[in-house]
Protein backbone atom coordinates (compact mmCIF):
# COMPACT_ATOMS: atom_id res chain seq x y z
CA UNK A 1 0.00 0.00 0.00
CA UNK A 2 2.49 2.60 1.12
CA UNK A 3 6.16 2.99 1.32
CA UNK A 4 7.08 4.35 4.72
CA UNK A 5 9.96 6.74 4.87
CA UNK A 6 10.09 6.12 8.60
CA UNK A 7 10.05 2.34 8.29
CA UNK A 8 11.96 -0.26 6.22
CA UNK A 9 8.74 -2.01 5.29
CA UNK A 10 7.23 -1.87 1.83
CA UNK A 11 3.60 -2.71 1.47
CA UNK A 12 1.27 -4.32 -1.02
CA UNK A 13 -0.57 -2.89 -4.00
CA UNK A 14 -1.99 0.23 -2.41
CA UNK A 15 0.15 3.31 -2.04
CA UNK A 16 -2.49 5.74 -0.84
CA UNK A 17 -1.00 6.36 2.60
CA UNK A 18 2.58 7.35 1.90
CA UNK A 19 4.26 8.56 5.07
CA UNK A 20 6.68 11.44 4.88
CA UNK A 21 8.27 13.76 7.36
CA UNK A 22 6.00 16.59 6.27
CA UNK A 23 3.12 17.74 8.42
CA UNK A 24 2.47 17.31 12.12
CA UNK A 25 1.54 13.64 11.79
CA UNK A 26 4.19 12.67 9.29
CA UNK A 27 1.44 11.84 6.79
CA UNK A 28 1.06 13.37 3.36
CA UNK A 29 -1.72 12.59 0.91
CA UNK A 30 -0.80 12.65 -2.75
CA UNK A 31 -2.57 13.02 -6.07
CA UNK A 32 -5.30 15.60 -5.44
CA UNK A 33 -5.49 19.08 -4.00
CA UNK A 34 -5.44 17.50 -0.55
CA UNK A 35 -2.63 15.17 -1.51
CA UNK A 36 -4.82 12.04 -1.84
CA UNK A 37 -3.90 9.46 -4.43
CA UNK A 38 -5.23 6.40 -6.16
CA UNK A 39 -3.50 3.08 -5.68
CA UNK A 40 -0.81 1.61 -7.86
CA UNK A 41 0.16 -2.02 -8.09
CA UNK A 42 3.49 -3.27 -6.84
CA UNK A 43 5.18 -6.56 -7.51
CA UNK A 44 4.78 -9.26 -4.90
CA UNK A 45 8.50 -9.33 -4.24
CA UNK A 46 8.25 -5.90 -2.61
CA UNK A 47 5.27 -6.68 -0.40
CA UNK A 48 5.37 -6.34 3.35
CA UNK A 49 3.64 -8.97 5.46
CA UNK A 50 2.53 -9.23 9.04
CA UNK A 51 5.64 -11.36 9.56
CA UNK A 52 7.69 -8.19 9.07
CA UNK A 53 6.48 -6.94 12.45
CA UNK A 54 9.02 -7.43 15.20
CA UNK A 55 8.15 -8.95 18.55
CA UNK A 56 8.36 -5.54 20.21
CA UNK A 57 6.06 -4.03 17.57
CA UNK A 58 3.47 -6.76 18.15
CA UNK A 59 3.67 -6.04 21.87
CA UNK A 60 3.26 -2.34 21.14
CA UNK A 61 0.17 -3.06 19.03
CA UNK A 62 -1.51 -5.10 21.74
CA UNK A 63 -0.62 -2.69 24.53
CA UNK A 64 -1.72 0.41 22.61
CA UNK A 65 -4.95 -1.32 21.51
CA UNK A 66 -5.84 -2.05 25.14
CA UNK A 67 -5.41 1.65 25.89
CA UNK A 68 -7.17 2.74 22.71
CA UNK A 69 -10.12 0.34 22.94
CA UNK A 70 -12.18 2.40 25.45
CA UNK A 71 -12.03 5.26 22.91
CA UNK A 72 -12.30 3.02 19.84
CA UNK A 73 -15.98 3.73 19.17
CA UNK A 74 -15.37 7.49 19.00
CA UNK A 75 -12.28 7.00 16.84
CA UNK A 76 -13.99 4.65 14.37
CA UNK A 77 -17.06 6.89 14.21
CA UNK A 78 -14.84 9.80 13.14
CA UNK A 79 -13.23 7.57 10.51
CA UNK A 80 -16.56 6.45 9.04
CA UNK A 81 -17.98 9.98 9.13
CA UNK A 82 -14.94 11.27 7.26
CA UNK A 83 -15.30 8.41 4.80
CA UNK A 84 -18.92 9.46 4.19
CA UNK A 85 -17.71 12.96 3.35
CA UNK A 86 -14.96 11.65 1.10
CA UNK A 87 -17.21 9.13 -0.64
CA UNK A 88 -20.92 9.89 -1.22
CA UNK A 89 -21.38 6.21 -2.14
CA UNK A 90 -20.57 5.20 1.42
CA UNK A 91 -22.94 7.82 2.82
CA UNK A 92 -25.71 6.48 0.61
CA UNK A 93 -25.06 2.89 1.71
CA UNK A 94 -25.17 3.82 5.40
CA UNK A 95 -28.28 5.96 4.84
CA UNK A 96 -30.16 3.13 3.13
CA UNK A 97 -29.10 0.70 5.85
CA UNK A 98 -30.28 3.06 8.61
CA UNK A 99 -33.59 3.49 6.82
CA UNK A 100 -34.12 -0.25 6.57
CA UNK A 101 -33.01 -0.72 10.17
CA UNK A 102 -35.64 1.78 11.34
CA UNK A 103 -38.34 -0.63 10.18
CA UNK A 104 -36.62 -3.78 11.38
CA UNK A 105 -36.11 -4.07 15.12
CA UNK A 106 -35.62 -7.84 15.20
CA UNK A 107 -31.92 -7.93 14.35
CA UNK A 108 -29.07 -5.47 14.04
CA UNK A 109 -28.48 -4.43 10.45
CA UNK A 110 -24.77 -5.02 9.86
CA UNK A 111 -24.75 -2.38 7.12
CA UNK A 112 -25.46 0.55 9.47
CA UNK A 113 -22.66 2.76 10.69
CA UNK A 114 -23.33 1.98 14.36
CA UNK A 115 -23.03 -1.76 13.81
CA UNK A 116 -19.95 -1.21 11.64
CA UNK A 117 -18.34 0.59 14.57
CA UNK A 118 -19.09 -2.31 16.93
CA UNK A 119 -17.92 -4.90 14.42
CA UNK A 120 -14.71 -2.99 13.71
CA UNK A 121 -13.86 -2.97 17.41
CA UNK A 122 -14.53 -6.70 17.64
CA UNK A 123 -12.57 -7.23 14.43
CA UNK A 124 -9.44 -5.63 15.88
CA UNK A 125 -9.80 -7.73 19.03
CA UNK A 126 -9.75 -10.89 16.90
CA UNK A 127 -7.13 -9.60 14.47
CA UNK A 128 -4.51 -8.78 17.08
CA UNK A 129 -4.86 -12.25 18.57
CA UNK A 130 -3.86 -13.77 15.22
CA UNK A 131 -0.68 -11.73 14.65
CA UNK A 132 1.46 -14.89 14.92
CA UNK A 133 -0.67 -16.83 12.43
CA UNK A 134 -0.40 -15.03 9.10
CA UNK A 135 -2.75 -17.42 7.27
CA UNK A 136 -5.54 -16.86 9.79
CA UNK A 137 -4.72 -13.14 9.88
CA UNK A 138 -5.00 -12.75 6.09
CA UNK A 139 -8.10 -14.95 5.81
CA UNK A 140 -9.94 -12.88 8.42
CA UNK A 141 -9.26 -9.66 6.54
CA UNK A 142 -9.92 -11.01 3.07
CA UNK A 143 -13.19 -12.49 4.27
CA UNK A 144 -14.36 -9.01 5.26
CA UNK A 145 -13.25 -7.60 1.92
CA UNK A 146 -14.97 -10.30 -0.12
CA UNK A 147 -18.21 -9.80 1.82
CA UNK A 148 -18.38 -6.24 0.46
CA UNK A 149 -18.17 -7.33 -3.20
CA UNK A 150 -21.95 -7.59 -3.35
CA UNK A 151 -22.09 -3.79 -2.93
CA UNK A 152 -20.24 -3.24 -6.21
CA UNK A 153 -23.28 -3.87 -8.37
CA UNK A 154 -26.13 -2.26 -6.47
CA UNK A 155 -24.24 0.55 -4.71
CA UNK A 156 -21.23 1.15 -6.98
CA UNK A 157 -18.83 0.27 -4.17
CA UNK A 158 -15.33 0.35 -5.66
CA UNK A 159 -11.72 -0.34 -4.73
CA UNK A 160 -10.89 3.34 -4.32
CA UNK A 161 -13.16 3.40 -1.25
CA UNK A 162 -10.73 1.03 0.50
CA UNK A 163 -7.93 3.42 -0.48
CA UNK A 164 -9.70 6.37 1.04
CA UNK A 165 -10.54 4.38 4.18
CA UNK A 166 -6.84 3.60 4.53
CA UNK A 167 -5.86 7.23 4.23
CA UNK A 168 -8.36 8.33 6.85
CA UNK A 169 -7.63 5.45 9.24
CA UNK A 170 -3.89 6.01 8.93
CA UNK A 171 -4.28 9.66 9.83
CA UNK A 172 -6.79 9.19 12.64
CA UNK A 173 -5.28 6.17 14.37
CA UNK A 174 -1.62 7.05 13.94
CA UNK A 175 -2.13 10.57 15.26
CA UNK A 176 -3.96 9.34 18.37
CA UNK A 177 -2.10 10.18 21.57
CA UNK A 178 -2.07 6.53 22.65
CA UNK A 179 -0.26 5.52 19.45
CA UNK A 180 2.12 8.48 19.25
CA UNK A 181 3.55 7.81 22.71
CA UNK A 182 6.12 5.38 21.32
CA UNK A 183 7.86 5.11 17.96
CA UNK A 184 7.36 1.33 17.92
CA UNK A 185 3.59 1.67 18.29
CA UNK A 186 3.41 4.31 15.57
CA UNK A 187 5.41 2.22 13.09
CA UNK A 188 3.48 -0.92 13.97
CA UNK A 189 0.08 0.69 13.42
CA UNK A 190 1.17 2.16 10.10
CA UNK A 191 2.32 -1.28 9.00
CA UNK A 192 -0.85 -2.95 10.26
CA UNK A 193 -3.24 -0.48 8.62
CA UNK A 194 -1.35 -0.58 5.32
CA UNK A 195 -1.53 -4.38 5.17
CA UNK A 196 -5.10 -4.38 6.46
CA UNK A 197 -6.35 -2.11 3.68
CA UNK A 198 -4.45 -4.02 1.03
CA UNK A 199 -5.93 -7.37 2.10
CA UNK A 200 -9.42 -5.87 2.34
CA UNK A 201 -9.04 -4.63 -1.19
CA UNK A 202 -7.55 -7.93 -2.31
CA UNK A 203 -10.49 -9.90 -0.89
CA UNK A 204 -12.96 -7.45 -2.42
CA UNK A 205 -11.39 -7.54 -5.89
CA UNK A 206 -10.94 -11.32 -5.82
CA UNK A 207 -14.61 -11.90 -5.02
CA UNK A 208 -15.62 -9.30 -7.60
CA UNK A 209 -13.68 -11.16 -10.29
CA UNK A 210 -15.46 -14.37 -9.33
CA UNK A 211 -18.84 -12.64 -9.57
CA UNK A 212 -18.00 -11.28 -13.00
CA UNK A 213 -16.68 -14.63 -14.17
CA UNK A 214 -19.81 -16.41 -12.95
CA UNK A 215 -22.02 -13.77 -14.52
CA UNK A 216 -20.16 -14.07 -17.83
CA UNK A 217 -20.45 -17.87 -17.76
CA UNK A 218 -24.16 -17.65 -16.97
CA UNK A 219 -24.69 -15.25 -19.87
CA UNK A 220 -22.87 -17.59 -22.24
CA UNK A 221 -24.93 -20.57 -21.07
CA UNK A 222 -28.13 -18.55 -21.30
CA UNK A 223 -27.15 -17.47 -24.80
CA UNK A 224 -26.58 -21.09 -25.80
CA UNK A 225 -29.98 -22.08 -24.41
CA UNK A 226 -31.67 -19.22 -26.23
CA UNK A 227 -29.93 -20.21 -29.47
CA UNK A 228 -31.03 -23.82 -29.03
CA UNK A 229 -34.60 -22.76 -28.29
CA UNK A 230 -34.62 -20.48 -31.33
CA UNK A 231 -33.25 -23.27 -33.53
CA UNK A 232 -35.85 -25.69 -32.18
CA UNK A 233 -38.63 -23.18 -32.89
CA UNK A 234 -37.38 -22.64 -36.43
CA UNK A 235 -37.23 -26.38 -37.06
CA UNK A 236 -40.79 -26.75 -35.80
CA UNK A 237 -41.91 -23.96 -38.11
CA UNK A 238 -40.13 -25.60 -41.05
CA UNK A 239 -41.91 -28.88 -40.32
CA UNK A 240 -45.25 -27.10 -40.15
CA UNK A 241 -44.57 -25.28 -43.42
CA UNK A 242 -43.47 -28.52 -45.04
CA UNK A 243 -46.57 -30.39 -43.86
CA UNK A 244 -48.79 -27.64 -45.23
CA UNK A 245 -47.24 -28.00 -48.70
CA UNK A 246 -47.81 -31.74 -48.86
CA UNK A 247 -50.71 -32.78 -51.20
CA UNK A 248 -53.71 -34.36 -49.53
CA UNK A 249 -54.11 -38.07 -50.30
UniProtKB/Swiss-Prot annotation:
Residues 20-43 are annotated as: Disordered. Residues 52-205 form the Globin domain. Keywords: Heme, Iron, Metal-binding, Oxygen transport, Transport. It holds the Pfam family Globin. One of its GO terms (molecular function) is metal ion binding. GO terms for biological process: oxygen transport; response to hypoxia. Heme binds at residues 116, 148. Belongs to the globin family. This is Globin-like protein 9. It comes from Caenorhabditis elegans.
